[in-house]
């Protein structure tokens, strides 16, 4: 189901100034520079998510391999009872279906299909779940304030901007922090804010070195400008305002 925005919000004023500066520089045209910056930011987000995406894709495949080895060992010892054999095959089929679903989910981060709407709370959880292991390792505690709401936003836009904001703020942190994530509907727009504050319990996170470059404020700006999302930056927080996602194509029923 493809979606479009109900309204279009301009990017931050700083983005407009950046576009003007690009034209004045006499180099790449501003629209092309904006697209290139957004693509670089998207690539940076995916590279930083790569370990988590790889884990999500491999975990079910490993389970299938282990189950197949167990079943093979039983067959080598002699034919198992029909009931036991059928139960093992059923479990193997279930694991295979879960593996396919997980692989398709990972692929949707790399190459999204038709954009679709997602409920705000579900979309936020989708992003936080991928960063959970990384944040735990580094000593970041997520405090979430995201009430359930039928309000939907673009899944692709939310993924890129929220993950970029979370990584940008935690990359800039001087140590373990509390990461406050709040999402609500304000005057017909989804307002998502991310704020960090130092932990007060003296916890020391493990040394961490990013698998790819650190993300910066310019990356978040480029993504927001490309998607026409309003963006506000504070000293230790980022707030974004996203329009409602509206379906523009009929639902497609997948063949069984």
Predicted regions located by residue number:
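Histidine phosphotransfer helical core of two-component systems
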Residues: 28-31, 35-38, 42-49, 60-98, ...
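Conserved catalytic submotifs in the C-terminal HATPase_c
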Residues: 141-150
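Conserved short alpha-helical segment within the C-terminal cytosolic histidine kinase catalytic core
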Residues: 125-141, 164-171, 219
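Conserved DHp (HisKA) dimerization/phosphotransfer helix of two-component histidine kinases, i.e.
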Residues: 67-70, 83-138
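Conserved ATP-binding N-box helix of the HATPase_c
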Residues: 47-70, 152-181, 213-227
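Glycine-rich/acidic phosphate-handling loop/turn and adjacent ATP-lid/helix
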Residues: 186-221, 242-245, 249-253
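Conserved signal-transmission helix
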Residues: 1-45
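Glycine-rich ATP-binding loops of the HATPase_c
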Residues: 225-240
């Amino acid at each position: 189901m493809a979606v479009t925005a109900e309204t279009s919000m301009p990017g931050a004023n700083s983005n407009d100034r950046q576009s003007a500066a690009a034209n004045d520089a006499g180099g790449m045209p501003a629209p092309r520079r904006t697209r290139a910056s957004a693509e670089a930011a998207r690539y940076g987000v995916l590279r930083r998510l790569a370990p988590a995406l790889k884990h999500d894709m491999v975990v079910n495949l490993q389970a299938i391999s282990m189950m197949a080895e167990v079943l093979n060992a039983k067959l080598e010892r002699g034919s198992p009872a029909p009931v036991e054999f059928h139960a093992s095959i059923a479990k193997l089929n279930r694991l295979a279906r879960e593996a396919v679903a997980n692989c398709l989910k990972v692929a949707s981060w790399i190459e999204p299909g038709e954009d679709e709407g997602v409920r705000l709370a579900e979309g936020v959880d989708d992003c936080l779940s991928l960063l959970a292991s990384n944040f735990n390792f580094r000593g970041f505690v997520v405090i979430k304030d995201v009430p359930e709401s039928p309000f939907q936003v673009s899944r692709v836009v939310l993924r890129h901007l929220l993950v970029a904001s979370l990584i940008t703020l935690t990359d800039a942190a001087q140590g373990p922090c509390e990461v406050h994530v709040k999402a609500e509907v304000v005057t017909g727009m989804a307002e998502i804010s991310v704020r960090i504050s130092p932990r007060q319990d003296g916890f020391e996170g493990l040394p961490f070195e990013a698998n790819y470059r650190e993300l910066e404020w310019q990356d978040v700006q480029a993504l927001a400008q490309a998607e026409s999302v309003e963006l506000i930056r504070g000293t230790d927080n980022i707030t974004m305002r996203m329009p409602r996602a509206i379906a523009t194509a009929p639902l497609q029923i997948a063949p069984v």
